[in-house]
Amino acid sequence: MGCSSSHRYKACIVLLTVLAPAWKSVSDPIEQVFALLAVYRRLLSDSDCVYGCPIGSLALELHEPDPAVRELLAVNFSGWVSHVKGCLDAAHDRLPADADTERLAIFVLTTMEGGVMQARTHRTLEAFDACVESLRDYFNRLQADATGSPK
């Protein structure tokens, strides 16, 4: 059973309720990625690291028992990847020519989800911040490689 257009539409609405505010005042596509991560950091901070990604939490709990739910979760994650990939595609001239923006987008989402999970587990932003700092360093290195400048 495939996801209906209505389900895909609802997944887009959820994405846009987080993305639109995050990207409102940021025009640089790579900085949009980090603005999204900053929104999640703020949500964690404001909740003393109790808030997490509700879709990520649901995905951990409902991995196999319900294929229809799993499919909706996949639509949601695919939507996140697609939006981040769009940012990275817009910055293609600042990334190495062989950069796979789909894989990079998956890496960004995994960094966010893993950082959120660790922050909630340890009730501290330390792991989340370390993940984002490492991701920032990686993007800086990619951009330096693309331009031939020193890292």
Kindly give the residue locations of the regions a language model identified.
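Hydrophobic alpha-helical bundle segments that form small-molecule/ligand-binding pockets
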Residues: S25-V26, P65-P67, S78-L104, F139-K151
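All-alpha amphipathic helical-bundle segments outside canonical DNA-binding/catalytic cores
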Residues: E31, E71-V75, H92-F107, R123-E126, ...
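An amphipathic alpha-helix adjacent to DNA-recognition modules
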Residues: M1-K24, F34, A74, V81
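Hydrophobic alpha-helical connector segments
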Residues: L19-Y51, T101-V108
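Hydrophobic alpha-helical segments that form the core
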Residues: G56, D98-Q118, S134-Y138
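Structural signal for well-ordered, non-membrane alpha-helices
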Residues: C12-L16, A20, R41, V81-K85, ...
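Amphipathic C-terminal alpha-helical segment
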Residues: L43-D46, L109-E126, Y138-T147
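Amphipathic alpha-helical segments used for helix-helix packing
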Residues: Q32, S47-A68
